[in-house]
A protein has these predicted regions:
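A short, basic N-terminal segment
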Residues: 1-58, 372-373, 383
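C-terminal leucine-rich, beta-strand-based interaction scaffolds used for sensing/assembly
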Residues: 2, 11-17, 21, 25, ...
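Short, Lys/Arg-enriched N-terminal segment that forms or immediately precedes the first helix
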Residues: 30-32, 291-306
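Short, conserved phosphate/pyrophosphate- and ester-handling motifs at nucleotide-, phospho-/glycolipid
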Residues: 41, 69, 264, 370
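P-loop NTPase nucleotide-binding core
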Residues: 54-66, 70-161, 344
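Conserved Walker B catalytic segment
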Residues: 140-202, 209-211
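Helix-loop-helix "sensor" segment of P-loop NTPases
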Residues: 206-259
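Amphipathic alpha-helical "lid/sensor" segments that cap RecA-like P-loop NTPase cores
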Residues: 243-299
């Protein structure tokens, strides 16, 4: 997820004072950067590093705000000690091949050692230029060829390297071309390992469940799933965070936060920051957490709905917010559309919502786990 909390701080009077001196705090709102900053993800961190050591590509799956970005950034510290460089590529909002190229360029510009190694080859690539600020991308007549040349330069010159594509489902519009490109990298440059994060739909689903005709058939990444915290782990997280900040808080207040924020690390962090850093009283901190969380969630849901049947998807989500069975969801869609949807339309919407990890299904009952999404839908803040 890439509507970063730090971006939201831009609306506050003095955002830096809330972060000053807290680079290692559990309640720092930026993605964690070091293994020691992670909480409750030791097993997943070890597994991720083990996969890279064995040169296995990895897909990190999980709902929004669960800590996927923090996990890969913390892993990078361990990987660098092993002599493996990492290029972090933020794909949130990237459109098409040019969007991917620009995102890759931004990632390369933070890894100067790799940039210097590939400069000789990349500088001769169409659409690629170097300046004082590093590498930049201009419009290319053959952007996928430019991408292949750039990745090829990394494969030939950078040594052991991990390329992290965060929110890979953003590239669904170029799935066909990208699958061929990834297959070529897999076959040609075994020193280049891809780590992919996102939800199980679009390009990610195609990568993890390739058909026999897919270029990636037989090359599927290993899956690493990040679960929300249990109630016990959520309580432990908050207690440790408040201890770090020397902030007193009651058992009852922690229990209420755990109950309302439902194990999502991002929301627990936001609540802790509101109490320990902004010094808001518990009740006000809960209100601010829910208000800010629903704004972030609304932005992300609007992004997901782009290019989709908004009426159908919102009808399904709204009825699932109070839990519903398939027939009830179909009836809600029919009411909102004022026409009878066919079964395939309903099923397709539900499958996409499950793949995007917006809804859960258990024994035929559809529910929404994320408390911010439930609040957003039940309070009619999105129509």
């Amino acid at each position: 997820m890439h509507v970063l909390f730090s971006d939201r701080f831009k609306t506050r009077e003095d955002p830096l004072k809330y972060l000053r001196g807290l680079s290692l705090s559990l309640f720092n709102l930026n993605p964690k950067e070091f293994p020691r900053e992670l909480f409750g993800r030791e097993k997943e961190l070890d597994e991720l590093v083990r996969f890279v050591k064995s040169r296995r590509w990895i897909a990190i799956l999980g709902p929004r705000m669960v800590g996927k970005t923090s996990l890969i950034k913390a892993a990078n510290v361990r990987l660098e000690k092993m002599g493996v460089k990492a290029i972090y590529v933020n794909l949130w909002g990237a459109k098409g091949t040019h969007g991917l190229l620009n995102a890759l360029a931004q990632g390369l510009n933070t890894e100067n050692s790799i940039l210097q190694k590939i400069k000789g080859i990349a500088d001769r690539t169409e659409g690629v230029s170097f300046g004082p600020g590093g590498i930049s991308i201009s419009l290319s007549k053959r952007p996928m060829t430019t991408m292949w040349d750039l990745l090829g330069a990394i494969g030939k010159q950078a040594g052991d390297c991990v390329i992290e594509l965060d929110e890979v489902q953003e590239l669904s519009t170029i799935s066909g071309h990208l699958l061929k490109l990834l297959a070529n990298i897999f076959n040609t440059h075994p020193n280049v390992i891809f780590i992919l994060t996102g939800s199980m739909f679009g390009l990610m689903k195609t990568l993890l469940e390739p058909r026999s005709t897919s270029p990636m058939y037989g090359r599927s990444p290993a899956k690493l799933y990040l679960e929300p915290f249990t109630k016990e782990k959520s309580s432990e997280f908050l207690k440790k965070g408040f201890q770090e900040c020397h902030e007193a808080i009651t058992k009852e207040q922690i229990e209420e936060a755990v109950e309302k924020l439902d194990g999502i690390p991002g929301w627990l962090t936001l609540y802790g920051n509101n109490v320990a850093i902004r010094k808001l009283p518990h009740k006000k901190a809960m209100e601010e957490t829910i208000s800010e969380g629903t704004k972030i969630t609304k932005d992300e849901l609007e992004h997901f709905l782009q290019g989709r049947d908004r009426t159908t998807y919102l009808a399904a989500l709204k009825v699932a917010a109070t839990s519903a069975r398939w027939k009830e969801i179909k009836a809600a869609i029919e009411t909102r559309r004022t026409s009878v949807p066919n079964d395939a339309t309903v099923q397709n919407a539900l499958e996409n919502l499950k793949a995007a990890m917006l809804i859960n299904e258990k024994e035929g009952v559809y529910t929404i786990k994320d408390p911010m999404l439930r609040t957003l839908l039940l309070t009619s803040q999105i129509t």
